[in-house]
UniProtKB/Swiss-Prot annotation:
Pathway: Porphyrin-containing compound metabolism; protoporphyrin-IX biosynthesis; coproporphyrinogen-III from 5-aminolevulinate: step 4/4. CDD domains: URO-D. It comes from Francisella tularensis subsp. holarctica (strain LVS). Belongs to the uroporphyrinogen decarboxylase family. This is Uroporphyrinogen decarboxylase. The gene is hemE. HAMAP family: URO_D. Homodimer.
Length: 344
C-alpha cells in the first residue's frame, strides 16, 4: 500500500505532500454519472457495495492520488435512526418529519438498532479497501451538522429552526447531539474495523455559529467522538469545519491529528494560528479549477512553495471543500500534475 497519506500524520517531515480531493468520486466524472443512472435514487446506490467501490476507484484510475474516501453520505446516521430521507432534484436531502420536540426525539431508534441498520456502509468500506492500494478514509458528519438537517428538514440559508432550538431549548439540542455523538463513535469504529485507515469528521455547518456556541454545540461533540475513538484505536482523525477559520485557536489543542482548512485563509495564516503538530489539509478554492491551465499551475505553485518552506509540519493537499459537479476533469489533472511537478 502507498502510505504517503498516512505518513503525513507522522513526526517526520515529508519530501512531498500527499493529495486527494473532497468528493473526488462524484458528478464531475462521466464514469460516475454512468453508474448513477443505474439506480433509482442516491441511497440505493450507497447501499450497493460494488457500486460504491466502483465509483471510489474512478478517480484513482484517472489521477495520481494518495488516498480514497468511502463513497457514502453524511446522512446515513439520521436515516438509520428512523428518519425518512429522500434526495430531491433541485432541493437536495429532505427529511419529511424533522425533529421539533422531545416527542420527535423519543421516536428515533435506539443506538443499537440504528447501528444495525448501517451494515451497508461497512460492506462498502470492506469492498473498497480490499480493491485499492492507497489508504481509505472513512467519514461522518459532525453531530451539529447532522442535527442541522434533522431539525430543518433540509438544507437552509439561515437555519432558523436549528438556531431557534439551540437558544430556546438547549437541553433538547444537547440531548440530540449527545445521542448522535454516541452513535457516531460506534459508526466510525465499525468503519475502521472494516478497513478504513483514517477518519474525517465533516462539520459542514459549524461555521454558522458564534464562537462560544461553536465550542459548546459543535466542537465539544467532535472532541468527545475523537477521544472515544482513539481510546479504542489510535488512527488519524481530521476535523473539518467549513467556514471555521475563526475557531482555529479552539481546535488546535483538541484530539484531532489534522485540521481541514478552507480558502478563506491562507495555509500560512492557518499554520500561524494552529501552531505546530497538526497536519493541515486544504485549501484550494474549488472554483480555481474553472481557471486556465496557467492560472491553475500558478495557484498550485504558490501553495506548494509555502508547504515546502515549512520544515516542521506536514500538509495534505486538497480543495477547501468538495469539488463542484461542473468542473472539467482535465483541470483536475492539471492541478495534480502541477502538485507533483512543483513538489519534486
Amino acid at each position: 500500500m502507498r502510505k504517503l497519506f498516512l505518513d503525513a500524520f507522522g513526526e517526520k517531515k515529508l519530501d512531498k505532500p500527499p493529495v486527494w480531493i473532497m468528493r473526488q468520486a462524484g458528478r464531475y466524472l462521466p464514469e460516475y454519472r454512468a453508474v448513477r443512472v443505474k439506480f433509482d435514487n442516491f441511497m440505493d446506490m450507497c447501499r450497493n457495495a460494488d457500486a460504491c467501490c466502483e465509483v471510489a476507484l474512478h478517480p484513482l484510475q484517472r489521477y495520481d492520488l494518495d488516498a480514497a474516501i468511502v463513497f457514502s453520505d453524511i446522512l446515513t446516521i439520521p436515516e438509520a435512526m428512523g428518519m425518512d430521507l429522500k434526495f430531491i432534484k433541485g432541493a437536495g436531502p429532505v427529511f419529511s418529519e424533522p425533529i421539533q420536540s422531545q416527542k420527535d426525539l423519543d421516536k428515533l431508534k435506539s443506538i443499537e438498532d440504528s447501528i444495525g441498520s448501517l451494515d451497508y456502509v461497512y460492506n462498502a468500506v470492506k469492498t473498497t479497501s480490499s480493491a485499492i492500494n492507497v489508504p481509505l478514509i472513512g467519514f461522518t458528519g459532525s453531530p451539529w451538522t447532522l442535527a442541522a438537517y434533522m431539525i430543518e428538514g433540509s438544507g437552509s440559508k439561515q437555519f432558523n429552526k436549528l438556531r431557534k432550538m439551540m437558544y430556546a431549548n438547549p437541553q433538547l439540542m444537547h440531548s440530540l447531539l449527545q445521542r448522535l455523538a454516541d452513535i457516531t463513535i460506534i459508526y466510525l469504529l465499525e468503519q475502521v474495523k472494516a478497513g478504513a485507515s483514517s477518519v474525517m469528521i465533516f462539520d459542514t455547518w459549524g461555521g454558522i455559529l458564534p464562537l462560544e456556541h461553536y465550542k459548546n454545540f459543535s466542537l465539544k461533540y467532535m472532541e468527545y467522538i475523537a477521544k472515544n475513538v482513539k481510546q479504542k484505536i489510535n488512527i488519524p482523525i481530521v476535523f473539518f469545519t467549513k467556514g471555521g477559520s475563526n475557531f482555529f485557536e479552539e481546535i488546535k489543542d483538541k484530539s484531532c491529528d489534522g485540521v481541514g482548512v478552507d480558502w478563506s485563509v491562507t495555509l500560512k495564516q492557518a499554520r500561524h494560528r494552529i501552531g505546530v503538530g497538526k497536519v493541515l489539509q486544504g485549501n484550494f478554492d474549488p472554483a480555481f479549477l474553472y481557471g486556465s491551465k496557467q492560472s491553475i499551475r500558478e495557484t498550485v505553485r504558490a501553495n506548494i512553495e509555502f508547504i515546502q518552506s515549512d520544515k516542521l509540519n506536514n500538509y495534505i493537499v486538497n480543495l477547501g471543500h468538495g469539488i463542484y459537479p461542473d468542473i472539467d476533469p482535465d483541470s483536475v489533472r492539471v492541478m495534480i500534475d502541477a502538485i507533483r511537478e512543483f513538489s519534486a
